[in-house]
A protein has these predicted regions:
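C-terminal regulatory/interaction module of P-loop NTP-utilizing enzymes
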Residues: 3-345
Length: 345
């Protein structure tokens, strides 16, 4: 479309210049038309330039996936730079970010409450910290809340108000993260729901208006439907309250895993195979980013079998480990080989 636009514009200019000159009254031969060499050259240059630009773009589109693969194979996953536009300026975020980072960032920047759900150790807390840094806001954190005062604060015996992380974020502005919201008592959601809906809240020290920069992100291991076999002690969250949150599923990110492993694809291949074998064996066990980090740190200190035992198995019952080993694929991987060999002893 861009090329055709250039050609059409050039053709409009070319047409009036292409008229032949008048013929003399008594020539022995008809006069030759004046050749518009300059316009022709201009048109050809426009066409050539357009085609060249399209060719470069086409080549780059084709080559980009291969270039990225070459870089990843030889140097590992490189940090990315993401530009964040706020109301006042533009900031750059450089580093390893989860593939859902930009989505969550846009939601938080737009003052939309977010609920991140995903397995333990998949980076939900890290996403929130990176978002607060990207937006230039303070980060406030609270784990599962089972008592209301841990959100609202309280007046102590000396008559002094004891502030909470939620109170500070609500009054001074910042990103407040409530981790394990599905492990918090349902009364907590009622409080958050009221604060989000009204933009004010009645704390023990009186009514407080929400700061314009107050943002909230919650996280959990379930979708708020209650406890399951893997995650016990979880509450069913109130549907009307949860409806105020944009729900984002956060899974393990392959690029982050590869970065943690220092580009060691054999480690990541083993971790992915181990997770799949856990599911196939119907065993409840978590292998998070932390397992990869331990595996990389310990592999130079111990032999492979001891490293697997300390970094991944971590006291797992031998029967469970055998069930998982039976479901591991038959591929050339030293970690899979050593695990199976260890369990045969």
């Amino acid at each position: 479309e861009r090329a055709m636009s250039i050609i059409n514009d050039a053709a409009k200019w070319w047409k009036p210049q292409s008229v032949a000159a008048p013929v003399a009254e008594q020539p022995t031969e008809p006069a030759a038309p004046i050749q518009p060499t300059t316009p022709q050259t201009t048109l050809e240059n426009l066409i050539a330039k357009s085609v060249a630009e399209l060719s470069v773009n086409s080549v780059m589109e084709t080559a980009q996936p291969f270039i990225e693969k070459y870089v990843a194979d030889n140097f590992g996953i490189l940090p990315k730079t993401i530009e964040v536009k706020t109301e006042t300026d533009t900031k750059k975020v450089t580093g390893y970010t989860h593939h859902e980072f930009e989505t969550v960032l846009k939601l938080v920047a737009a003052d939309i409450p977010v609920f991140l759900t995903g397995p333990a150790g998949c980076g939900k807390n890290v996403i929130c910290k990176q978002i607060s840094e990207a937006l230039g806001k303070e980060f406030y954190f609270s784990n599962a809340v089972t008592q209301e005062y841990k959100i609202t604060g309280f007046i102590d015996a000396n008559g002094k108000y004891q502030e909470t992380q939620f109170y500070k974020a609500f009054t001074h502005g910042g990103v407040f993260m409530l981790d394990e919201m599905d492990a918090s008592t349902p009364e907590v959601l009622v409080i958050l729901n009221a604060a989000i809906a009204n933009r004010y809240f009645d704390f023990p020290v009186g009514r407080v208006e929400a700061h314009p920069d107050f943002r909230i992100v919650a996280a959990g291991n379930t979708y708020g439907t209650g406890a399951d076999i893997e995650y016990t002690g979880r509450f069913q969250l109130d549907a009307s309250s949860l409806d105020r949150f944009a729900i984002i599923e956060v899974s393990y990110d392959n690029d982050i895993e590869l970065a943690i492993a220092g580009g060691d694809k054999e480690v990541i291949e083993f971790i992915h195979a181990f997770r799949s074998a856990i599911v196939a064996a119907d065993i409840k066990f978590t292998v998070s980013y932390r397992a990869i980090e331990r595996l990389v740190k310990l592999k130079g200190m111990f032999d492979t079998q001891k490293t697997i035992q300390l970094a991944v198995l971590r006291g797992m019952e031998k029967d469970d480990a055998n069930m998982i080993a039976k479901n591991l694929p038959k591929i050339s991987n030293q970690y899979i080989y050593e695990l199976k060999k260890m369990l045969k002893k």
